[in-house]
Amino acid sequence: MKLAPWALLAVAMAWGWAFVIMKDAIQRQSVNNFLFTRFLLGTVVLVLIRPQVLRLLNKDVLLRAGAAGTFLGLGFIFQTLGLARTGAAITGFVTGLYVVLTPLIAWLVLKQKVNSFTWSCIAVATVGLGLLSIHGFSVGIGELLVFISAICFACHIIALSKWSSGRDVYAMTVVQLFMCGLLSGIASIPGGYSPPPDASVWGVVIFTAVFATAIAFIIQTWAQAHMSPTKVAVILTMEVVFAAIFAIIFGGERLTLQSALGGILVVTAMYLIVIKESK
């Protein structure tokens, strides 16, 4: 499907922008509270736009989308726990390792073969992620928690590639977002829930809920019915590149030679995958 890789690239762009605007918001609201509000609002928006989707929530959709949403929700929670214990740059790199974990898990679980061209793109993307993110590295509990999140994100990509085809994309997305909200809500219980403290944070919540959550996951769920999980993972690594670009343009961050080289490598890997997929 020629449109699918470009649609996923748009998703990566939305997530990259969300990463930049969330930085200030999660300083003023706990991350789990932010995620709970974001995913709950995203679910409500989807249901309000198309209320008849509730009739499509049969056992098959609930089980498969619920499982995919559980992987996604756990990924966000473990990533958050790790982020509290290690640096943001290292968190970005370790999370991005799902580009390596996705084909490995797909090979082990689904027996999907990965050709040498795709493995080459994976290697290039991984090196690029490292150059973009790493400025010193040590392995501790934070890094291990983030690595678990990368496994969860890889499992989410594989689950969507396995279960999206032949099922209603909208219904699948609603259930996934609900599961993420439910898990984030449970994670918020120990510290209690507090709503966004001001209009600025509410603005970020609304943007991420509508564009980086509801619309983005509809596109991802649809696109993955037409692409292999490994190629999806490589394209989605562009989130890190877009985040860096937006941070430089709008956040006043400085572009280093190392970051530039890393970005070029990730873009190269993504471009090769997209061009091959579009043929």
Which residues are covered by each model-predicted region?
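Membrane-interface interhelical linkers
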Residues: M1-A10, T43-A67, R85, L108-W119, ...
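Specific alpha-helical transmembrane segments that line the substrate/conduction pathway
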Residues: N33-V44, T80-Q112, T118, S149, ...
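Hydrophobic alpha-helical transmembrane segments of multi-pass membrane transport proteins
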Residues: L9-I21, I49, G66-R85, L131, ...
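Hydrophobic/aromatic residues within transmembrane alpha-helices
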Residues: A25, F34, R38, G82, ...
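Transmembrane alpha-helices of multi-pass small-molecule transport proteins
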Residues: R28-L74, L101-I105, C152-A159, T173-G191, ...
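Hydrophobic transmembrane alpha-helices of multi-pass small-molecule transport proteins
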Residues: L46, L72, I105, V114-S133, ...
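Alpha-helical transmembrane segments and their helix-entry boundary regions
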Residues: L8, V20, V31-L35, A65, ...
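Hydrophobic residues within alpha-helical transmembrane segments
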Residues: W6, A10, T37-L41, A67-T70, ...
